[in-house]
C-alpha cells in the first residue's frame, strides 16, 4: 500500500480498491469503489454503461471520503466532516464560500489519465530549451524569489498557455492558490513527476529577471508564472490568527455626500418648447383668463335668508341678550313718559 502525504492527524491516504497500489482520486457511487486515475479510466472505458457512471472527487484533506463541497477560497474539495471541522476553526474561515460538488463526467475523468502525447510534448520542450538557452548553468547561483527564468530567450506567452492547460483545464490537478493568507485547509498535493519537474527545470535557467533589456511582456503571463511557482512551492497554507487585523479593505467606503446625491430626488429635465408650442400655450392661457368668473356664488340659501332677518346693531349682528336688554330699556322709557312721574321723588 502506498502512503501519501499525511495531514496533521497523521492519517493514511485511502488506496485504490482495484490495484491496491496507488492512492484513490475519485469515488464511483454506482460501483461503491474508490479508484485511482488509471483504474478509473480503464474500468469506465470498458462499455457504454460503465462510462455513464457518476464519479466524485475524493476529499483533499482526509483522502478517505468522497468530496461534497468545493471551497473557493482554498480551492479544495472537502467531504462533509472535513468541511465542518475546518470552516469552524475561526471567524475568517466561516466566511469562506462553499458550493456543492456536481458529479464528474467521463471526459473530465479520462483527461486525468497519462498519455503518450504529453510525454512527447515534454521531450520537445526540453529539446527546444536546450537549443534556445546557451549555457544554462552559468547563473545558477543568482536566485530571485526562489526561481529564475530568462526574459531574453523564454517565450512567456507560449509557456503561460501550456501552464494554463495544465492547471486550469484539468479538474483533477491539485493546486493551491495564493489568496493573501486566506487558506486554512491543509491540502495533500500530488506532484506530477513529468510537468512539475519540467517546470522547475525551466524556472532555474540562471538568467537574471529584469526589464532593463527593453522587452515588453504581457502582465497576464507574469501572473501565470507566479501562480505556477506558488503551486510547486506551497503544499499547505494556514491562516495565522494575527493576520486577520492586517487585512486591508480594497473598496473604500462611500461618502455621505455621494449617498445623499444618489438617494435624492431625480433632477427634472427642462423641456425645450418650439415657438409654435409656446404661442399655442399663451393663447390657451388668454382664453381661460377671459372666461374667468369673479362674482360670488351663494352656496347656502338658508343662511342668506336668515342673515337678512337677523337683528343688527350698528350694522353688525346682535346677540339675543343685547336685543332683549335694549327692548326693555326702550319700553321702560316710554312708560315713564306716559305716567308723568319718575321713580325718585324730587323735593
Swiss-Prot record:
GO terms for cellular component: nucleus. It is found in: Nucleus. GO terms for molecular function: DNA binding; DNA-binding transcription factor activity; zinc ion binding. Zn(2+) 1 binds at residues 16, 19, 39, 44. This is Zinc finger protein CONSTANS-LIKE 2. Putative transcription factor. Does not affect flowering time. One of its GO terms (biological process) is chloroplast organization. Transmembrane segments: none annotated. Keywords: DNA-binding, Metal-binding, Nucleus, Repeat, Transcription, Transcription regulation, Zinc, Zinc-finger. Its main location: nucleus. The keyword Nuclease does not apply. The keyword Nucleotidyltransferase does not apply. Belongs to the CONSTANS family. InterPro entries: CCT_domain, CONSTANS-like, CONSTANS-like_Bbox1, Znf_B-box. Induction: Expressed with a circadian rhythm showing a peak at dawn. Zn(2+) 2 binds at residues 59, 62, 82, 87. Highly expressed in leaves. Expressed at lower levels in stems, flowers and siliques. Not detected in roots. Residues 278-320 form the CCT domain. Pfam families: CCT, zf-B_box.
Amino acid at each position: 500500500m502506498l502512503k501519501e502525504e499525511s495531514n496533521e492527524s497523521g492519517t493514511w491516504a485511502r488506496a485504490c480498491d482495484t490495484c491496491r497500489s496507488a492512492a484513490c482520486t475519485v469515488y464511483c457511487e454506482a460501483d461503491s469503489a474508490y479508484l485511482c486515475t488509471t483504474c478509473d479510466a480503464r474500468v469506465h472505458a470498458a462499455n457504454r454503461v460503465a462510462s455513464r457512471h457518476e464519479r466524485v472527487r475524493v476529499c483533499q484533506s482526509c483522502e478517505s471520503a468522497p468530496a461534497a463541497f468545493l471551497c473557493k477560497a482554498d480551492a479544495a474539495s472537502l467531504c462533509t466532516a472535513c468541511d465542518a471541522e475546518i470552516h469552524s476553526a475561526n471567524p475568517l474561515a466561516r466566511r469562506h464560500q462553499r458550493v456543492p460538488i456536481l458529479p464528474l463526467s467521463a471526459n473530465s475523468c479520462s483527461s486525468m489519465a497519462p498519455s503518450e502525447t504529453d510525454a512527447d510534448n515534454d521531450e520537445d520542450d526540453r529539446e527546444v530549451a536546450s537549443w534556445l538557452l546557451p549555457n544554462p548553468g552559468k547563473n545558477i547561483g543568482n536566485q530571485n524569489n526562489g526561481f529564475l527564468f530568462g526574459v531574453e530567450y523564454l517565450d512567456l506567452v507560449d509557456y503561460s498557455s501550456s501552464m494554463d492547460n495544465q492547471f486550469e483545464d484539468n479538474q483533477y490537478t491539485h493546486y493551491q492558490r495564493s489568496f493573501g493568507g486566506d487558506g486554512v485547509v491543509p491540502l495533500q498535493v500530488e506532484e506530477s513527476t513529468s510537468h512539475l519537474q519540467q517546470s522547475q527545470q525551466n524556472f532555474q535557467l540562471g538568467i537574471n529577471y529584469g526589464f532593463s533589456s527593453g522587452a515588453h511582456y504581457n502582465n497576464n503571463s507574469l501572473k501565470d508564472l507566479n501562480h505556477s511557482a506558488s503551486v510547486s512551492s506551497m503544499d499547505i497554507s494556514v491562516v495565522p490568527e494575527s493576520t486577520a487585523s492586517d487585512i486591508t479593505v480594497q473598496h473604500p467606503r462611500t461618502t455621505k455626500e455621494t449617498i445623499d446625491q444618489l438617494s435624492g430626488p431625480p433632477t427634472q429635465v427642462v423641456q425645450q418648447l418650439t415657438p409654435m408650442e409656446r404661442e399655442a400655450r399663451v393663447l390657451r392661457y388668454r382664453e381661460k383668463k377671459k372666461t374667468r368668473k369673479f362674482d360670488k356664488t351663494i352656496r347656502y340659501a338658508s343662511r342668506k335668508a336668515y342673515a337678512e332677518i337677523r337683528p343688527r346693531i350698528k350694522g353688525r349682528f346682535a346677540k339675543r341678550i343685547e336685543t332683549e336688554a335694549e327692548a326693555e330699556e326702550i319700553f321702560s322709557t316710554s312708560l315713564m313718559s306716559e305716567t308723568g312721574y319718575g321713580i325718585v321723588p324730587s323735593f
